[in-house]
């Protein structure tokens, strides 16, 4: 997804562009290493959002688990990301058109492929869609969980997730996140949930810091916030006779932006789409609390 910023000070954004190529020269610094969080339980290594992926990510030594949640037609939270079951499974249709029993008969690894390997290795090895409760049970009891809610309308999903977290005793270690503002708002109203900052607010603050050095909107104490370490954006400058457009690979997280988010006690920040040891060292250098990775198997080497 590409965001468009309406700006006059184009040069400031362009100065942020480019892919990091400094990591071999970056020291690891004196602070603690950033948490390594398995994105969709490790979407590159194993079929995403499955118990198989979760257990292997735990074995790889991740510090946190990022799981994508929707709700079945009979109100049970399950792990699945796309809007159509056909994208990843041997089924079809939206998640909330099926009961949990029907969903668990599908193979979540049906379309999974391994880079550089032909074929679909899990078509003969079923990997069911797990319930959120099953997924929680597959994680260590002290592991932080990030639950990315991916379904509208929001309230059935939010209420069902809250019930599972209460029943399993996992609410205290779970952070609810969504790119959808309505879901974030509904989760914030739900008693007992810890909710990450709205992506819209996070993005606005990062651009304000990059373009006019203002830490605004004010950080929200105690919340998590996340954004990509590198993000492709389109910058549009308006003129009387038209407009000028520049494509930028922006690095919006830097030491100043991290300090901005931390200006209110307790706020924690995560870099999304961290793919290489260079990215990890950059995240360490600027002080991010956590990084979101697709391959826990690769990431386990970054701390050595």
Curated annotation (Swiss-Prot):
Organism expressing this protein natively: Mycobacterium tuberculosis (strain CDC 1551 / Oshkosh)
Annotated signal sequence range: 1-25
GP-PDE domain sequence ranges: 34-303
Name this protein carries in UniProt: Uncharacterized protein MT2337
Pfam families reported for this sequence: GDPD
SUPFAM superfamilies: PLC-like phosphodiesterases
InterPro entries for this protein: GP_PDE_dom, PLC-like_Pdiesterase_TIM-brl
GO terms for MF: phosphoric diester hydrolase activity
Keywords: Signal
Taxon lineage: Bacteria, Bacillati, Actinomycetota, Actinomycetes, Mycobacteriales
GO biological process: lipid metabolic process
CDD domains registered for this protein in UniProt: GDPD_Rv2277c_like
